[in-house]
A protein has these predicted regions:
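A generic "binding-loop/recognition-motif" signal
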Residues: 33, 42, 53, 72, ...
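A short, N-terminal "cap"/entry segment at the start of jelly-roll beta-barrel domains
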Residues: 1-32
Length: 109
C-alpha cells in the first residue's frame, strides 16, 4: 500500500481538543489506523483529552514542545517519540519559536 500525502489536502484546525492556536494537518484514516503529518503553529497546543481510539504515537520531526501524559511531563524535540496509550489522558504544547512538526500515528485497538 502506498499513501501519497502530496495528494491529500492540507487542513487548518483551530484549538484542537479545546487547545490553543492553530495547527495544520493532512489526515489519512482507515479502520486500523490514522496517519497525520501535523504542524502546531505559534501559540498552539492540542488540548487535554483521553485517547479513546487507540495508542497515539507522535514522532517529532522538528521544533520543541512538551507532552503531559497522565500527569507525567515529557520534553519534545526532533528525534523523540511521545506515546500515549489508549485510555490515557494527554496534551501536546508547542514551546519553541518554530512550528512543532510531528508525524502522528493512531493505532486502533
Amino acid at each position: 500500500m502506498l499513501i501519497d500525502f502530496n495528494e491529500i489536502q492540507e487542513i487548518k484546525i483551530p484549538c484542537m481538543n479545546d487547545g490553543t492556536g492553530m495547527m495544520t494537518v493532512k489526515m489519512y484514516n482507515d479502520e486500523n489506523y490514522r496517519i497525520i503529518p501535523t504542524r502546531i503553529h505559534k501559540g498552539g497546543s492540542i488540548g487535554t483529552h483521553t485517547q479513546n481510539s487507540g495508542d497515539d504515537l507522535n514522532y517529532i520531526i522538528s521544533g520543541k514542545g512538551k507532552a503531559i501524559c497522565n500527569g507525567a511531563e515529557e520534553e519534545l524535540k526532533a528525534g523523540v517519540m511521545h506515546i500515549c496509550p489508549k485510555g490515557f489522558e494527554h496534551t501536546i504544547i508547542k514551546t519553541g519559536d518554530d512550528d512543532l512538526e510531528m508525524l502522528t500515528i493512531v493505532v486502533a485497538k
